Amino acid sequence: KKNGYAVDSSGKVAE
């Protein structure tokens, strides 16, 4: 998690 968002290994953010 980063800043309350889940971030995948490619750095894309999914809410």
UniProtKB/Swiss-Prot annotation:
Keywords: Ion channel impairing toxin, Neurotoxin, Secreted, Toxin, Voltage-gated sodium channel impairing toxin. Coiled coil: none annotated. The keyword Secreted applies. It is found in: Secreted. Transmembrane segments: none annotated. GO terms for cellular component: extracellular region. Its main location: secreted. Expressed by the venom gland. GO terms for molecular function: sodium channel regulator activity; toxin activity. Excitatory insect beta-toxins induce a spastic paralysis. They bind voltage-independently at site-4 of sodium channels (Nav) and shift the voltage of activation toward more negative potentials thereby affecting sodium channel activation and promoting spontaneous and repetitive firing. This toxin shows an evident analgesic effect on mice, but is devoid of mammalian toxicity. Belongs to the long (4 C-C) scorpion toxin superfamily. Sodium channel inhibitor family. Beta subfamily. This is Insect toxin BmK AngP1. It comes from Olivierus martensii (Manchurian scorpion).
